[in-house]
Amino acid sequence: MSDTIRTLQGRVLSDKMDKSITVAIERKVKHPLYGKFIKRTTKIHAHDEQNQCNAGDLVTIRECRPLSKTKSWTLVEVISKA
């Protein structure tokens, strides 16, 4: 295992849960046959201790120990508000 902590940037899709947010991580993947770059989206559940995020915010999250069945990321900062 490496000692670096994984951090990602994404947009908040949902903040309806208590102390939790759903973040959409967008990445570009090259199509194997045609070579065109395609956008792929991954949804990640993250922990938001102060409930400071709203839907549409641009945020930075980092990996942590598992907090629940689906949450293993925590909010680091809100880059821009929606």
Curated annotation (Swiss-Prot):
**A Gene Ontology cellular-component term:** cytosolic small ribosomal subunit
> Does tRNA processing show up as a keyword for this record?
no
Quote one Gene Ontology molecular function term. rRNA binding
Q: Which UniProt keywords apply?
A: Ribonucleoprotein, Ribosomal protein, RNA-binding, rRNA-binding
Q: Which Pfam families match?
A: Ribosomal_S17 (PF00366)
| Coiled-coil positions | none
Q: What does this protein do?
A: One of the primary rRNA binding proteins, it binds specifically to the 5'-end of 16S ribosomal RNA.
Q: How does it assemble?
A: Part of the 30S ribosomal subunit.
Family under the similarity heading? Belongs to the universal ribosomal protein uS17 family.
Under which name does UniProt file this protein? Small ribosomal subunit protein uS17
What is the species of this protein?
Shewanella halifaxensis (strain HAW-EB4)
Q: What is the lineage of its organism?
A: Bacteria, Pseudomonadati, Pseudomonadota, Gammaproteobacteria, Alteromonadales
